[in-house]
Amino acid sequence: MVFAAPCWVPPLPSDLPDSTTLEEFIFCQVKDSQTRSELDRSILICGTQGKEYTVQESMERTGRLAQGLSAWLDWPQKPSEEDWKVAAIFNINCVEFFSISHAIHRLGGTVSAINASSTADELEAQLRLSNAQAIFTCNTLLKIAMKASQKVGIPLANIFLTDAPGSYRPDDVYPFQEIDNIVRTARSSLPLLQLGRGQGSSTPAYICFSSGTSGAQKPVLLSHQGIIANIVQINTFEKFRQKGPNVSLCILPLAHSYGLVCVAYNALYRGDRLAVLPSSDVEDLLSIVEKLRINTLYLVPTLLSRILSGGKAGGHDLSCVKEVYTGGAPLHPMLGEHILRHHPTWKTKQCYGATEAGTAVSVTSDCDLWPGSVGCLLPGVQAKIIRSDGSETTKHDESGELWVSSPSLAIGYLSNPLATEATFTVDNTGRTWLRTGDEAKICLSPNGNEHLFIVDRIKDIIKVKGFQVAPVELEQLLLSNDFVEEVAITSRQDKRGEERPQAFVVRTHEGLKEPQDAVSESLQALVKARKARYKWLHPHVIFVDSLPKTTSGKIMRRALRNMCPANSEVNGRLSSKI
């Protein structure tokens, strides 16, 4: 049984551009649809420094940056699989992200978006996986970028700086090039890249990292046409909702496909002004919402919880807020109930997607709000629910693995055909399906609309603050400790009701000689030293005599989760916090 968008959702246009870059699609349509006075209106706003760019300024800046980078990196303007050009953006959120990205795209290159919280080891791994030849970063992250680039062989000359604030500037070691200087000294402006017919679907625009259905981080190739398709899908679904240009806020990491596609590019396509904030500081967020009168927020549940906790929202005028979209992780029911009680005018809407899907798969509509649902399928998306025996479900309310097909699907994983083949499957009609690894079901709402519900994650990936954490990544690290014989990582809620990696450890003979607290502290310190903050362990390591396993030797993670304290106890503490 194949499911699709509700009948009241307009159909997806059949003429999605297949020879257009993202920059041309976003900015040229805005440029063509606006009056001269509107073209002088800012579309990009730096939320901290107040710097603004119009459509004209953004495209001119991009062209000059592309010209300068072409000469500096010796990159000709052409897309070519033989001449693979990849530049990594390892930076906090900033408005320069788009000029850099589009300049690389004008050169026929691909942008590898890397989370700013990555450690030097993690950055090194992702630079290798993406085959990056240049890095764009800021002063704050420069030391990490230098360490990782040295290990992968990227020359210091290929590290470029934005003007984000920071103190680490080893100019006495190397005079790093700044973006503003390249733009200022460029002799001309490089024009838009002209893709050939059909190249939009085969030319990667971005590499975003995902753990897929299992295993460590893998580079996902998102094409120009795939991202364009997802933007059109979202806007077609929300066509009846939009009432003229708005001010949107991007506080979610642009290295995450949710922040990149669903928030940033979606807003720019609508003609919104996009305010970009570099961090998830709650006070900064609330202040800019109040100042710019932002009425739609795109958040992850953990950030929403921080906004509502401790009465922080009470000190600001948030009467402008009408809608709150959450994605990246499930919305805790108690958090939804809190919003209903204290902010009844806010429409809280969940959405669902995956990096491999090109991001969004389903979105909640004003027409049919249903608590717990992640909304209705977007136009052009087809879904089916696959039972454990491989057969398709034939009715509503039956759970199984969610498979989706969409024009926005990723090209696949870079240089990993086995993982691509395992995740993307082609049926006998030639249609490609993404195996999401998520257990889901389709249910009919009281209004008769089909809604998607995510039941559980079949895959072992843990979601922390919207970011994916692969258990195997932490397990391999912990096994390097002399006190660890065996280890399994699963998920557990902390006292705030947020998901954290939970370690179950079988100690070695040497480990048994040490106090449990000492071993626990050793393991916590190891993870904190080597991994990003969102990968840090739950404070309480659980020590066991053995790990529950199947007859084939596979760890039974669900049995381990059942050994954790009951969620009801955790939830009770959460309710006292907000």
Swiss-Prot record:
GO cellular component: peroxisome
More about this protein: Gene clusters encoding host-selective toxins (HSTs) are localized on conditionally dispensable chromosomes (CDCs), also called supernumerary chromosomes, where they are present in multiple copies. The CDCs are not essential for saprophytic growth but controls host-selective pathogenicity.
EC class (word): ligase
EC number(s) stated in the UniProt entry for this protein: 6.2.1.-
Function, in words: Acyl-CoA ligase; part of the gene clusters that mediate the biosynthesis of the host-selective toxins (HSTs) AK-toxins responsible for Japanese pear black spot disease by the Japanese pear pathotype. AK-toxins are esters of 9,10-epoxy 8-hydroxy 9-methyldecatrienoic acid (EDA). On cellular level, AK-toxins affect plasma membrane of susceptible cells and cause a sudden increase in loss of K(+) after a few minutes of toxin treatment.
Name of the protein: Acyl-CoA ligase AKT1
UniProt binding sites for ATP: 210-218, 350-355, 438, 457, 554
MF terms (GO), sorted A to Z: ATP binding; CoA-ligase activity
Gene: AKT1
Region (SBD1): 281-350
Free-text disruption phenotype from the record: Abolishes the production of AK-toxin and impairs the pathogenicity.
Main location: other
Matches recorded under Pfam families: AMP-binding (PF00501), AMP-binding_C (PF13193)
Motif (Peroxisomal targeting signal type 1) on chain: 576-578
InterPro entries hit by this protein: AMP-bd_C (IPR025110), AMP-bd_C_sf (IPR045851), AMP-dep_synth/lig_dom (IPR000873), ANL_N_sf (IPR042099)
Region (SBD2): 351-413
Keywords: ATP-binding, Ligase, Nucleotide-binding, Peroxisome, Virulence
Record's keyword annotation contains Nucleotide-binding: yes
Subcellular location: Peroxisome
Presence of the UniProt keyword Nucleotide-binding in the record: yes
Pathway: Mycotoxin biosynthesis
